[in-house]
Amino acid sequence: MATMLEGRCQTQPRSSPSGREASLWSSGFGMKLEAVTPFLGKYRPFVGRCCQTCTPKSWESLFHRSITDLGFCNVILVKEENTRFRGWLVRRLCYFLWSLEQHIPPCQDVPQKIMESTGVQNLLSGRVPGGTGEGQVPDLVKKEVQRILGHIQAPPRPFLVRLFSWALLRFLNCLFLNVQLHKGQMKMVQKAAQAGLPLVLLSTHKTLLDGILLPFMLLSQGLGVLRVAWDSRACSPALRALLRKLGGLFLPPEASLSLDSSEGLLARAVVQAVIEQLLVSGQPLLIFLEEPPGALGPRLSALGQAWVGFVVQAVQVGIVPDALLVPVAVTYDLVPDAPCDIDHASAPLGLWTGALAVLRSLWSRWGCSHRICSRVHLAQPFSLQEYIVSARSCWGGRQTLEQLLQPIVLGQCTAVPDTEKEQEWTPITGPLLALKEEDQLLVRRLSCHVLSASVGSSAVMSTAIMATLLLFKHQKLLGEFSWLTEEILLRGFDVGFSGQLRSLLQHSLSLLRAHVALLRIRQGDLLVVPQPGPGLTHLAQLSAELLPVFLSEAVGACAVRGLLAGRVPPQGPWELQGILLLSQNELYRQILLLMHLLPQDLLLLKPCQSSYCYCQEVLDRLIQCGLLVAEETPGSRPACDTGRQRLSRKLLWKPSGDFTDSDSDDFGEADGRYFRLSQQSHCPDFFLFLCRLLSPLLKAFAQAAAFLRQGQLPDTELGYTEQLFQFLQATAQEEGIFECADPKLAISAVWTFRDLGVLQQTPSPAGPRLHLSPTFASLDNQEKLEQFIRQFICS
């Protein structure tokens, strides 16, 4: 795999002395400086608008057109102007003076307010089932409440917060080149906070540094001390004690006990009282909606859903009239110290371990000019009360993946059921089980909705673009980088960089230095070669950040590939594939099949969006990007002829959430629509590029289907996942498909096959065990499953 960094493509040997390669990194590329024209002087999209379907009032009232014109600020850049003083001494002590000037509101009488809260008092007086009643000694109960409260939080220490902010500011300036924040997004959040409603930030989770960087950012912007809901499993006791004094919150282990446990009832009542007190006092709260980095599990965090449940319950009972939810995301060029060891990813971070990691980061960056960049994204706030009242879902009847896909995989039927997929990988913990069933569903849909908004508002960094080009485009990095940047902006996503093209490429390649090799083949020409093995796996993980931008087109391209799989040879020319007519019904069916196969954690469909609405969106995207062209069949009314259309009676009474084809009022007319693949010169390469974006996941699924013949079953879920991961690694060594050798892809394949009915789970004394279902015990059905998956893969 070779990629040219210059305009001409050459084929030369890849070998080069290591000393000569090292000189390439140190001496620069020696190429002509060129300005980035695609996004300088063009409209930069303002991303992060809230859902107009679920929260229309917030969409209009909590947004101001003027804020889109504001620029960016570097939140870790503190100068003399950021303090009240001036002079040469201030310029040397500006970090320290800035930390002293930060306003930290005091927290007084918190334990007494918690004890006097309605929930705790009702529990102590025996007014709720499981209450202690009059039989217990009040002093012992108060001590138990204080013990639970001490596990949850501690009053923030102003001196410690200021000292930590000063040290963190110095550390961030050594680690990061800049931490960019859109001034318009910050202004939007500040204006929303002026209404007096509490802010609840719901964030993605790239690294443990997110929980430190976001509070520092909000403190520097004058929004006070951010209370962070941490995961107890990710921190040691000593680190938890430090984080509590800095404003951290931890869920007590008793809160996950059974519903009839008195200890669990008391712990949940205390946590609920703590959340209510935070919301009443107006302190901002940060909740992570994703699992901690390195955790092998579902993307949506069960702990994050539990914290969201407490906030929803506080608003529903009227403790606070409303709360403003702010989707947040933090993106990095490279995630600092991302855990990559499957055996040690779940180990808690200790205080001394964290200190050594900080020192190691500082030592590695000492004298290094290539520091990483970061971007903080604050999406448009929206009203939680409005979402509770007006949130709607297109889910009517739901079916499991086994009911939807298994008959089609086995060839027993061809029609796709007109229903949504039910797939919930995130376990429901004790705090969420304590809510009503409809409230549990509300919390799950809200969490999925906000996580989708956070991912959609994330900017694409230069390293993600570079990794994608190195994996899936093999021509000219300079030209393709500009093209891909423009395609991202045209789709309403933002990029986390700007500057000159040569500098951007040099910056990203320097950060990816451990995974690529630079070879000079002639004067002015440079060859970029990805390192085989783990380097390709790392590049595939980086390129996955680009998938949300092109996800609709990628799903559509793979669906078209599946539709053409049985008609033309896989290696057939593009002109031969463009001759075939593709009906709209066939396209809908293939898109639905692929949608059901792909995990919900990847698609992140909003609950207010139906599958058929998404199918229409995918088809529209394929037409807009020029891959599909409408074909007028003889005797049919042209698609552009809207003058003779008449309103159908059934359209007049459709639900407002039912978004169907706007060009046709009768489904019978839509059935007759046909499309062809476009014959434009750029279409074959772009079609292949879109298909390859989903190829790591689909190839992992196909290899998991082939592994059914070799897997040792029955086994535990973790044991079988480890078996599959070792098989993916062995296959990668043989075939060179290293982008599939990812433990997250392995566990995603195992869970998908479990939902599909390929694997069945049975209880045992040692825990649940997986075994092969009788239906897929035959080699014939296993081959049908593998062929069903491989039809969507473009070789």
From Swiss-Prot:
Cytoplasmic side: 1-305, 473-795
GO MF entry, a single one: 1-acylglycerol-3-phosphate O-acyltransferase activity
Reactions catalysed according to its record: sn-glycerol 3-phosphate + an acyl-CoA = a 1-acyl-sn-glycero-3-phosphate + CoA; a 1-acyl-sn-glycero-3-phosphate + an acyl-CoA = a 1,2-diacyl-sn-glycero-3-phosphate + CoA; 1-(9Z-octadecenoyl)-sn-glycero-3-phosphate + (9Z)-octadecenoyl-CoA = 1,2-di-(9Z-octadecenoyl)-sn-glycero-3-phosphate + CoA; 1-(9Z-octadecenoyl)-sn-glycero-3-phosphate + (5Z,8Z,11Z,14Z)-eicosatetraenoyl-CoA = 1-(9Z)-octadecenoyl-2-(5Z,8Z,11Z,14Z)-eicosatetraenoyl-sn-glycero-3-phosphate + CoA
Any single GO CC term annotated in Swiss-Prot or TrEMBL for this entry: mitochondrion
Residue ranges of the region described as Acyltransferase: 180-331
Region ranges (Disordered): 1-21
Location of the motif HXXXXD motif: 205-210
Pathway of action: Phospholipid metabolism; CDP-diacylglycerol biosynthesis; CDP-diacylglycerol from sn-glycerol 3-phosphate: step 1/3
Keywords for the protein's UniProt record, in alphabetical order: Acyltransferase, Lipid biosynthesis, Lipid metabolism, Membrane, Mitochondrion, Mitochondrion outer membrane, Phospholipid biosynthesis, Phospholipid metabolism, Phosphoprotein, Transferase, Transmembrane, Transmembrane helix
Residue ranges, Mitochondrial intermembrane side: 333-449
CDD domains attached to this UniProt entry: LPLAT_DHAPAT-like (cd07993)
InterPro entries given in the database record: GPAT/DHAPAT, GPAT/DHAPAT_C, GPAT/DHAPAT_LPLAT, Plipid/glycerol_acylTrfase
Polar residues bias (residue ranges): 9-18
Membrane topology: Multi-pass membrane protein
Phosphoserine, modified sites: 656, 662, 664
Any Pfam family: GPAT_C
SMART domains: PlsC
Residues with PTM Phosphothreonine: 660
EC main group: transferase
Family statement: Belongs to the GPAT/DAPAT family.
Free-text function comment from the UniProt entry: Transfers an acyl-group from acyl-ACP to the sn-1 position of glycerol-3-phosphate producing a lysophosphatidic acid (LPA), an essential step for the triacylglycerol (TAG) and glycerophospholipids. In vitro also transfers an acyl-group from acyl-ACP to the LPA producing a phosphatidic acid (PA). Prefers arachidonoyl-CoA as the acyl donor. Required for primary processing step during piRNA biosynthesis. Molecular mechanisms by which it promotes piRNA biosynthesis are unclear and do not involve its acyltransferase activity.
Record-given protein name: Glycerol-3-phosphate acyltransferase 2, mitochondrial
